[in-house]
């Protein structure tokens, strides 16, 4: 199973994702670690990334998830995944195709749960202002909010408000993962 912890900057993707992975004993990847230097420089200068900037990065993340799946590993990935097209690329490794050609069995679609962390502008802004040493400045939060396409059917997702303790958020996700894993095991028995 693959869990993608998604949301705008400041939503807590890395903290939640790393704690969840540790609690579950799964591998953790932070998508920020895979941005090319050009992307990091662009963002640190306050310039939002465009679709062309993101596509190779998303394809690399897809390859990582495919490799882990082939090895039989479960993965938690912290990744903004702001647009439906970006999430499609994460799942298929190809040019976005949702909804026209959506296929339930596309590469990672049936194995992936998106966890959308969301919160008020006030909470997100405060978190970004408190964060030190990150290439993503507070000034880009508005552009990320404008870009965000919250997940919806047929995507597999849950949405969690981040205005609570991290341990509560992690427990909520863990409960959902347990339910999904039980459903998979039940389906395999049938």
Curated annotation (Swiss-Prot):
One of its GO terms (biological process) is carbohydrate metabolic process. This is Probable gluconokinase. It comes from Xenopus tropicalis. ATP binds at residues 7-14. Keywords: ATP-binding, Kinase, Nucleotide-binding, Transferase. It catalyses: D-gluconate + ATP = 6-phospho-D-gluconate + ADP + H(+). NCBIfam families: therm_gnt_kin (TIGR01313). Belongs to the gluconokinase GntK/GntV family. Pfam families: SKI. The lineage of its organism: Eukaryota, Metazoa, Chordata, Craniata, Vertebrata. Transmembrane segments: none annotated. It comes from the Eukaryota. GO terms for molecular function: ATP binding; gluconokinase activity. Its EC number is 2.7.1.12. InterPro entries: P-loop_NTPase (IPR027417), Shikimate/glucono_kinase (IPR031322), Therm_gnt_kin (IPR006001). Coiled coil: none annotated. Gene3D superfamilies: P-loop containing nucleotide triphosphate hydrolases. Pathway: Carbohydrate acid metabolism; D-gluconate degradation.
């Amino acid at each position: 199973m693959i869990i993608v912890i998604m949301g705008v900057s400041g939503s807590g993707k890395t903290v939640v994702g790393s704690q969840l992975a540790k609690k579950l004993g799964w591998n953790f990847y932070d998508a920020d670690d895979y941005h090319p230097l050009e992307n990091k420089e662009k963002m640190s200068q306050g310039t939002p990334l465009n679709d062309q900037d993101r596509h190779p990065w998303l394809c690399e993340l897809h390859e990582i998830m495919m490799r882990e799946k082939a090895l039989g590993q479960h993965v938690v990935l912290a990744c903004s995944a702001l647009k439906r097209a970006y999430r499609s690329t994460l799942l298929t490794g190809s040019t976005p195709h949702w909804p026209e050609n959506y296929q339930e069995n596309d590469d990672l679609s049936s194995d992936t749960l998106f966890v959308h962390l969301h919160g008020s502008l006030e909470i997100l802004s405060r978190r970004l202002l408190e964060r030190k040493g990150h290439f993503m400045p507070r000034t880009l939060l508005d552009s990320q909010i404008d870009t965000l396409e919250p997940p919806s059917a047929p995507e597999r997702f849950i949405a969690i408000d981040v205005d609570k303790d991290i341990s509560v958020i992690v427990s909520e996700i863990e409960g959902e993962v347990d339910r999904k894993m039980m459903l998979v095991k039940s389906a395999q028995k049938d």
